Each structure stands twice: as C-alpha cells, then as structure tokens.
Amino acid sequence: VDQETGKVDVTRYTAIQDAGKAIHPGYVEGQLQGGAVQGIGWALNEEYVFNKDGIMENPGFLDYRVPLASDLPMIETIIVEVPNAFHPYGVRGVGETGIIPPLAAVGYAVGNAIDRKVEELPCSPPRVLSLIKNS
C-alpha cells in the first residue's frame, strides 16, 4: 500500500482448488486465474459510481476500471484432485469459486498494511487514503 497515494499492489497470489478429477488441467488453471483476476478487480477497483441524480457515471469500458495485466501479479495455481463421488467423471466445478477469496484476502491484507479494519470494498486509492488519514 502506497501511504501517499493509497494505491494497492497485489504482489503475489496463489489459487488452490479441489477440482475433483481435473480432466483438462490447463483449463482448470485458466479458470482459477480468471476468477482470481476478477476477484482482485472487485477488491481493488470495480464499482458503479452514481451521481446525485442517480445517473451512472462510469457506464462503459473507458470509465469502469477493470484490472489490466500490468496491475496483476503472476497467479500461481495449485490443483488438488479429490474425485467427486457424486459425479460420473469425478469432476467438480471450478469456474466460479476463484472469484470470492480475493475480496477477503485483499481487504485483510490492506487492513493489515495500514493498521485499520477495511469494512467496505473496493480498496480504491481514495478509499484507502481516507482510511489512512482517519486512523
């Protein structure tokens, strides 16, 4: 966390998932990485901004901030394979699960770095600066 700007950099991220039987491990890895990227985006930048009249101020890709490759660390993946006894091929869903953990992980890491409890996401620079200044 940059104490002067409030910018947060995620320097390392590891996604671990029980995929049941990973029929296509490369695809599983891609799903875990994609979910982590989306979760990191939600944790750091992504939010709808409305003006006082209720009009969205960031309705498009030019205004709605999603993470770029340069914003992200290399995302390590670890695939655990415990076959699912309730599926004929032993597989488990992995497409959605990677999205949620970054929200808690990033929020907790930011709170640790600035010695404040983070109670609202995203941890955008203005929000982080506000937490730092109000400590």
Q: Each predicted region: which residue ranges?
A:
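C-terminal catalytic domains of large/alpha subunits in multi-subunit enzymes
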Residues: 1-135
